[in-house]
Amino acid sequence: MTTKKLGRQTVALAHPPSVAGHANVVGKKEGEGPLAACFDYIDVNDAFGESTWEKSERAMQQKALALALEKAGPGEGQLDWLFAGDLLNQCVSSSFAAREQQCPFFGLYGACSTMGEGLALAAM
């Protein structure tokens, strides 16, 4: 995507960015709450069939990515880059979830800003 710098900290994008596909997955507890109908996938427990929290988080990210690519549709599901982050051990879960993809991975560690940071970087 072509960009143009406007000053030191502002970038104007030649074409507006868009989100081709998105998904969210949750554990049993969230699935029992008032937002249950809003989730794409609710696991039967919080472990996603795994034995550790790290493996569970990896499985959760892999499921969310697979669903997002599926919802994006043919052609849109091709990844050029993968931006992901988590709060667990400096992106361990994100790194392991991303290694199955055939594209460059950018690990983000921005705590609460990870989503906004990822969207901004991916737009460029």
Feature roles, as predicted:
Residues 108-124:
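Active-site-proximal alpha-helical scaffold in enzymes
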